[in-house]
Structure formats: structure tokens, C-alpha cells
Amino acid sequence: MGKLIKLITTLTVLVSLLQYCCEFNSGSISCERTQTLCHYTNPRVWNTYFSRNCELYKNKVSPGFDIVARKYDTAVKPVIDDATVKVNKAAIQPAFKVIHSQCKKWNCGKYYQLVRSPMVKTRRFFFAKYNAFVKPNLDKFFTAEFRSHLKERILKYKNIGHYYFTITSRCIKSKYDFTVGNTEEKLMGKFKNKDTHGIHGSVTREPSSEDMVLTVSTMESDEEELTTTSTQTVVETITLDQEEASAVANHAHDDEASTDVEGSTDVNVNEQALLQEDFDMWSETILQKTQDVIQLFEKDVSKYINGKLVEEANHFKAKFQSLDDKSKKFFSKISLAINDIECVEGIDSETGKKIFFDKSGSTEISQYITRELVREYFNETRSTLDELTNAMEKDLSEITDEIEKKVNAIREENVEVFEEWGDIIVNEWSKRMAYVDVINAHMGADDDTTLDEEKAKSSVNWKKFLKGKKQIIESRDKLAHHSADLSRVNAFRQKVQKKILSFTQESGEFLYILRSKANLQFQERERKERERKEREKAAAEEFQRQQELLRQQEEEDEEDVSYTSTSTITTTTTMTL
């Protein structure tokens, strides 16, 4: 609630200040949007509008609004007007006198020279850049005739632009003096005099054909126009007297003459000075070009490596997935064989051959699981996984070699571009220096001292040229040996190798566990087989012992029968005798 009250208070203050400014400057506001803003933020306008369209507002609110408006006009507004007059007399007018006295001393010519000096330096800088980068390419596409014609047109428009720039600066100064004088009269006169808002001087008013009618659409009434405000566009025509016109013409003539003099001395004086200044920028240009080529090389390498690594990452992801699937398949095969080590032997009722079932005895297995068979499974798994991981490492090495070859190709391409640029730059600079030497030889001064100075400058310039040429060669060697950033490639390689090593260790550990489990199963089966054989052997020995006992018993029985028969025969014989 407090924030809402602050917002309402702020809006009220802003609207009040706006309305005061609108009322104070009601005769000098020419902007249609400002008039519209003043109109639609005026409380009196809205009071009239709501009074016409709402009976409740007309009867309940409008009388109170009229009372507040009258109190504002009688009690508040006079106080504000007096305070404004005092502030104007005590602060604004003295400050304006000081500012106006300083502004009267303003000289367009000095400021023109002040602005022209950095513009000349900028022109020289762009001229050097143009000769270094743009001109060699333009010479390939445009003929000498076309360039000569274009140069004439540019020189013509340059003189025209210089003339109009001078005229414009004069007009701006005249406009400034006129505006400042008008404002001074307004501030120094009566504080609020609506008759002093006219435009003084040689000014012609031409009303525009467009008038803006500000209306507020009604809700239920047929009256659409609430307030109509007409605006006019003032067209200012500045008329110069004969003296001012002749002064402008003379100044323009002097500018044209100075332009001709500058044009005639550019080759003889400025070209030599410009050449000496440009040698300092040439070194910076070579360094900048070297940095640009290196940045372009690094950008191309980074772009290629990013795309290549994304592509290869997807390929290796598929390879690791295939490796994982195959390893699971082999591990499942070995685990199933280990579970079938403890099998049950049976006899086929049809063929009479031995058949084997799992330990539950419900599922027939394809073959009897032996140590040799399980060992073969382990060897097959180990060899297959080793082949797959070795193939992945080989692919990784090939990818690294491919990236290095591509990076070297990109480097060679950028080196060739820099060499071509360097050849063009050296050629253009040699032509330019030879041209300056020829011009100095034919247009130089007759004074021997000046001639010696020109020769010394030429010698220094040629030494600087040789230094710049060596700098280009050194920059070329620097670019040729600039190492590319392969940290992401190395990180990718280490990541893949680490993953391969991790898979190899995990698969080896799992195979070791399976091998141990298989050994335990085989040992258990062999123990049971030994026990079974011992039981069978014991049973066989017991059976043999029983057979031996039975045989002995039979022999004893046979002996008893033989004795009885002998006794009977003896008795019979005796009785017969």
C-alpha cells in the first residue's frame, strides 16, 4: 500500500510539473507530440470529458474538482510563479549572461581546425590500411582507366563536400548567434510575456497544410471534438546580406585554393612524411596480420576438432556398446556351461547311448561339460575381447594421426595465405617507395642541403623497408611453427584409452571369477565322481568277497556229499562180503 501511495504521489508531481511547463510555454510549443502529451495529461480536459458523459461524475465529483482548481489558481499558482521569477532573476539570468558571453567568443575556424587534425590522421591511417589490404584486391578487378575516372570523380566530390561543409558551418554559426540572441531577449525580458515568443530575424513563416485535431472519443454522446489545437510548421529562411555573402564566397574561394595547394603538395611533401609515418604502422600491421592469421588458424583447427571429436565420440560409443554386448554374450555362455558342470547322466531308451541332463534333471544338455571345453570357452572369450580392444586402440591412433595431418594441412594453407599477402605487401611497398624516390628526384628542391636530407630519408626508409620484409619472413616462420591446441584431442584419447583399460580390467576380473567358479564346480564334480567310484569299488569288492564265500561254501558242500557217498559204498561192500 505504501508503494502504491508513493507511485501515485510521484505521478501527481510529474503531471503537475508537466502541466506547469505546458502552461508556461503554451505559445512556443511546436512539437505535435508534446502538444498531445500536454493535452491528454491536463486534468481540466478529463474533468470536462467525464462531466459531459457521466451524470454521477458531474453531480458528485466535478463540483469538488472545480473548488480544488479555483484554490490552486488563487493560492498555489501565485506562489509558484513568484518562486519561479525569483529563481530566474537570481540564478538563470546571471548564469546565462556568463554562458552567452563565453559563447560569443566561439570561432568556427579554430574548432574546424581542431576537428580537422584528427580527421587528417584518421585519413592517413585508413589510407595506409587501404594500400595494404584493399588496393591489391581492387587492382585485380578494375582497369587503370576505370581507376583514373573514379579518382577524378572522388576529387570532384571531395571539393564539393569541402565547400558545402564550410557553408554549413557558417550557417550553423549564424543560426547559433540568432538563436542565442533570441533566447537572451526572452530571458532578459518580462518573465511571462506571451507576445515575445515570435522568431526574430529574417525568418519567413509558412503554415503547413496539415493541422492536427486532438479529440477524445465519447461513449454515449454524439459530440466527438472536445478540444481542437492547430499547429503550424515554421520554415526558416536565413537571408545573408551582401557583406556576409561576399565573405562566404571569399572563404570558399580560399578553401578551394588551399585545397588545390594541398593537392599539389601532397606528392612532394605529405607523401614523404606519410611514408615515414606509415613505416611505424607497417610493423603494427604485420603484427596484427600475423595475429589475425594465427587466430584464424586456431579457429579453423578448433572448428575441425570439435566436429571430428563429436563424430568419433558417437562412433566409439557404438563400438563400446557392441563390445559390451559381445562380452555379455560370452560371459552368459560360460556361466551356462559352469551351471551344467553338475549334470545328471542318463541312458537314451531308443539308442542306448548316454545322455546328460542339468542338475535338476529336467533339461537335456547338448554335450558333457569338460575342463577342456570350458577352457576353450575362456580362451575364445579372451582372444575375441582382446581383438576388439586392440582394434579400437588402432582406430584411436589412426584418428589422432588423421587429426594431426589435417591440422598440418590447415597450417600450410594459412602459411600460403600469409606468404601471398606478404608478397603483395612487399611488392606494393617497393613500388610506392620507388615512386616517391622518382618524384623526389624530379620535383625536389634545388638546395643541396634539402637534397641530402631527402636522400638520407630515402636511405632510412629503404632500411625500414628491409626491416619490415625481414619481419614478414620471421612472422611466416612463426606461423609455420605455431603449435595447435590439441588438448581436447589428447583428452579424448586418454578418455577412450581409460575406458578401454577399465573394460579390460573388469572383463579380466569377471573371467577370473568365472574361472574360479568353474574350478570349484569341477572339483566338486570330481570329488563326487571319486566318491562314486570308491563306492562302486567297495561294492565290487564286497560282491567279489560274497562270491568267494559262496564258492567256498559250495566247495565245502561238495566235500560233504563225497564223504557220505564213500561211506555208503564201503558199508555196502562190507555187507556184501
Swiss-Prot record:
Annotated GO CC locations: mitochondrion; ribonucleoprotein complex
Sequence ranges of Basic and acidic residues compositional bias: 525-545
Signal peptide, first to last residue: 1-23
Keywords: Coiled coil, Mitochondrion, Ribonucleoprotein, Signal, Sporulation
GO biological process, one term: sporulation resulting in formation of a cellular spore
Compositionally biased intervals (Low complexity): 562-577
UniProt keyword annotation of Calcium present: no
Chain segments carrying region Disordered: 525-577
UniProt main location, coarse: mitochondrion
Coiled-coil region(s): 379-416, 513-561
Protein localization: Mitochondrion
Top-level taxonomic group: Eukaryota
Family (UniProt): Belongs to the SHE10 family.
Reported function: Involved in spore wall assembly. May be a component of the mitochondrial RNase MRP (MtMRP), a ribonucleoprotein endoribonuclease involved in the cleaving RNA transcripts to generate primers for DNA replication in mitochondria.
Subunit structure: Component of the mitochondria-localized RNase mitochondrial RNA-processing (RNase MRP) composed of one single RNA encoded by the NME1 gene and at least 31 proteins. Absent in the nucleus-localized RNase MRP (NuMRP).
Protein name, per record: Outer spore wall assembly protein SHE10
Organism, scientific name: Saccharomyces cerevisiae (strain Lalvin EC1118 / Prise de mousse) (Baker's yeast)
